[in-house]
């Protein structure tokens, strides 16, 4: 994504706006539910357990057998994560739930990892008959249980099957978790977050592909397995700001409001030069 594109902003269609408005209502419902029970997203998904680094929560992860959407929450060791972050959700769509026509990007280097000691991997459990799985977006949560950042990762991080950004964007609408466990409110919230921030997620996926290809050209490494490249794009977010933008679009539907959302700033942790976090 060129610098000029980032400066101008991200175009948002009327169809996307409608989905974002609906998602905003779900987010508000989830907030009210959690507040009424004096709970938060992390406590819900971990059932108030002490968080152990690298363990996936809940036990067995969350998988919807109808949509084939999947997610888990985990945290890195305290010395390897930002001090404001408590952990993050990784979201996926498995092969059986993908739209028609999506094709994995297969390169010979995918099977090569010339690393003496590979870093920890956060691969999802296999569910369903097929192996292919796409990582959609990760959502970082702060110590208060609020979302603070969206980010994408290199292939080795989750062991995913690599699909082009445009194909992964087509998968976003198919992330639906209708299950009640471990928490119906968390399941609804994650799906709504993907829709509420859909323009930003799509832009992050495009940035992910640019980061990976730029790294590959400059460093001539097996990029998908290179542990030096972990975070491929990231964006700090403020939920209340996004909700206010959506409210503006809803209150002024005839004025072309919210045709654009704020542009992505220069990415950290992997953006362009691929500095892993």
Which residue ranges define each predicted feature?
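Compositionally biased, low-complexity repeat tracts
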Residues: 5, 124-126, 141, 270-273
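Compositionally biased, intrinsically disordered low-complexity regions
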Residues: 11, 89, 140, 147, ...
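Short amphipathic alpha-helical "recognition" segments used for binding
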Residues: 57, 74, 273-276
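Aromatic- and glycine-enriched beta-alpha-beta binding-site module
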Residues: 60-148
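N-terminal domain-onset segments
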Residues: 1-65
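Conserved binding-pocket/active-site segment within a compact domain
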Residues: 110-227
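Long, compositionally biased interface segments
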Residues: 184-277
């Amino acid at each position: 994504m060129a610098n000029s594109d980032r400066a101008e902003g991200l175009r948002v269609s009327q169809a996307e706006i409608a989905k974002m408005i609906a998602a905003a209502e779900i987010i508000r419902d989830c907030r009210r539910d959690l507040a009424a029970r004096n709970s938060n997203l992390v406590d819900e998904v971990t059932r108030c357990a002490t968080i152990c680094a690298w363990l996936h929560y809940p036990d067995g992860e969350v998988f919807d057998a109808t949509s084939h959407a999947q997610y888990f929450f985990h945290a890195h060791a305290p010395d390897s994560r930002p001090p404001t972050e408590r952990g993050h959700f990784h979201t996926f769509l498995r092969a059986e739930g993908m739209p028609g026509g999506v094709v994995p990007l297969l390169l010979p280097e995918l099977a090569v990892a010339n690393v003496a000691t590979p870093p920890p991997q956060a691969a999802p459990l296999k569910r369903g008959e097929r192996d292919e799985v796409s990582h959609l977006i990760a959502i970082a949560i702060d110590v208060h249980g609020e979302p603070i950042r969206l980010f994408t990762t290199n292939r080795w991080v989750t062991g995913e099957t690599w699909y082009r950004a445009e194909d992964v964007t087509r998968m976003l609408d198919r992330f639906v978790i209708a299950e009640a466990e471990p928490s119906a409110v968390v399941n609804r919230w994650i799906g709504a977050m993907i829709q509420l921030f859909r323009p930003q997620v799509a832009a992050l996926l495009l940035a992910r592909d640019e980061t990976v290809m730029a790294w590959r050209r400059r460093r001539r490494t097996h990029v998908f397995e290179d542990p030096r490249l972990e975070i491929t794009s990231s964006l700090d977010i403020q939920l209340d700001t996004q909700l206010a933008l959506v409210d503006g679009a809803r209150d002024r539907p005839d004025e072309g409001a919210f045709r654009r959302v704020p542009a992505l700033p220069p990415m950290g942790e992997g953006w362009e030069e691929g500095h892993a976090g």
